[in-house]
């Protein structure tokens, strides 16, 4: 919940904040894209480490890394707003700070997912992952609301709040979360190392990557779309972007506490339904010229995200052994980050050509992934 709220705070204010310090659209989106690549590379290593040393210390490490990284990232923009840093030097400093943060904060997601898998029976795995997703969704709902309120005190206020929240979560985990036992150390040459090409999970991992290529493309150009179409200033853009993200997160939350807890479908069925909802949402966003219609599109996106990601996590967890839970959780956690590498860059470049091309790009990605999954099921 803490990381979900923190990330939604960043996404809500980064576009207007970047424009305040005269960074271009491609520079702003590339900060997310390149740091996401770092996140993707680091996540599997943290997942495997949690298999050996236990989940709790890795979760705490990730939360503390998020705290320190956010403070450094915020300080860079504070210096930029003061006029001390500008241009390429400011961009490089912000990129370095975000990448450093990504190396350590990537520890939290795989270790948390593996902890949930360790403590749930196979027949309840999809529901358990949905509950974990619900906690993240609650943070994502609250984040934009908090961001909009705090933005009245300045664009940096939400980031300081995110750092405080992550530090509080680390303290809570340290005090309250039961320890998980260390596993016996296996010699390096005998360790089974899961790869993205593993036949048991590769279709699920590819789906997750495609899903977030499309979603991140929309998310990272949303602030530009609102600011340009509604002619907003920086603070207004942060508030409206936060509201749009809150709509998406609200639908994610609702579908995870209702549909996914009541319907007994296979993970693959949930994934296909979710992709169809996201395709509708992206298509609506491509033609949206006022906020109510845009909110409808974001609602469809949130519904799709709520159906797909817990199902991907559950399907991957069920496909591997107990000794591989941390490893597969690390791979699944890396997939959104990989999507955030390509999505913002492609959508940011297309947005500069025409604003509608960004959501159309995302719709095309959702359609392609859906078609490939349907064809795979028919084989």
Language-model features: where?
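Helix-to-loop junctions at the C-terminal end of transmembrane segments
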Residues: 42-55, 254-267, 351
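Short amphipathic helix-loop junctions that connect adjacent transmembrane helices
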Residues: 12-27, 221-239
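C-terminal ends and interior cores of transmembrane alpha-helices
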Residues: 64-87, 277-289
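Juxtamembrane intracellular "pre-TM" segments in multi-pass secondary transporters
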Residues: 178-206
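C-terminal transmembrane helical hairpin of 12-TM major facilitator-type secondary transporters
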Residues: 267-312
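Transmembrane alpha-helices of Major Facilitator/SLC transporters
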Residues: 37-41, 240-263
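Cytoplasmic helix-loop-helix junction between adjacent transmembrane helices
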Residues: 97-136
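Hydrophobic core of transmembrane alpha-helices in multi-pass small-molecule transporters
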Residues: 82-107, 293-307
């Amino acid at each position: 919940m803490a990381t979900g709220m923190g990330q939604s705070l960043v996404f809500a204010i980064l576009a207007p904040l970047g424009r305040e310090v005269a960074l271009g659209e491609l520079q702003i989106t590339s900060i997310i894209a390149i740091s996401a690549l770092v996140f993707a590379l680091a996540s599997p290593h943290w997942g495997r480490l949690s298999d050996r040393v236990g989940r709790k210390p890795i979760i705490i490490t990730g939360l503390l890394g998020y705290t320190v990284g956010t403070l450094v990232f915020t300080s860079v923009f504070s210096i930029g707003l003061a006029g001390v840093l500008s241009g390429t030097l400011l961009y490089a400093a912000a990129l370095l700070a975000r990448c450093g943060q990504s190396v350590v904060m990537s520890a939290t997601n795989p270790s948390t997912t593996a902890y949930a898998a360790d403590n749930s029976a196979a027949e309840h795995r999809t529901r358990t992952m949905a509950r974990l997703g619900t906690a993240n969704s609650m943070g994502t709902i609250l984040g934009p609301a908090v961001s909009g309120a705090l933005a009245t005190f300045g664009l940096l206020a939400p980031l300081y709040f995110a750092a405080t929240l992550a530090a509080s979560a680390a303290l809570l985990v340290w005090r309250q979360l039961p320890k998980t036992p260390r596993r016996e150390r296996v010699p390096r040459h005998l360790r089974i190392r899961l790869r993205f090409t593993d036949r048991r999970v590769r279709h699920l991992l590819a789906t997750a990557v495609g899903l977030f290529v499309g979603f991140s493309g929309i998310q990272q150009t949303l602030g530009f779309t609102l600011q340009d179409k509604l002619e907003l200033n920086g603070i207004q853009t942060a508030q409206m972007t936060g509201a749009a993200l809150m709509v998406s997160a609200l639908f994610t939350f609702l579908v995870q506490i209702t549909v996914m807890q009541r319907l007994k479908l296979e993970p693959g069925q949930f994934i296909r339904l979710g992709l169809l909802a996201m395709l509708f949402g992206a298509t609506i966003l491509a033609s949206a010229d006022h906020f109510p219609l845009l909110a409808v599109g974001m609602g469809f996106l949130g519904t799709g995200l709520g159906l797909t990601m817990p199902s991907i996590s559950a399907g991957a967890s069920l496909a591997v052994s107990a000794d591989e839970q941390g490893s597969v959780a690390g791979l699944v956690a890396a997939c959104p980050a990989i999507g955030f590498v390509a999505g913002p860059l492609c959508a940011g470049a297309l947005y500069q050509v025409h604003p509608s091309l960004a959501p159309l790009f995302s719709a095309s990605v959702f359609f392609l992934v859906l078609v490939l999954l349907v064809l795979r099921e028919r084989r």
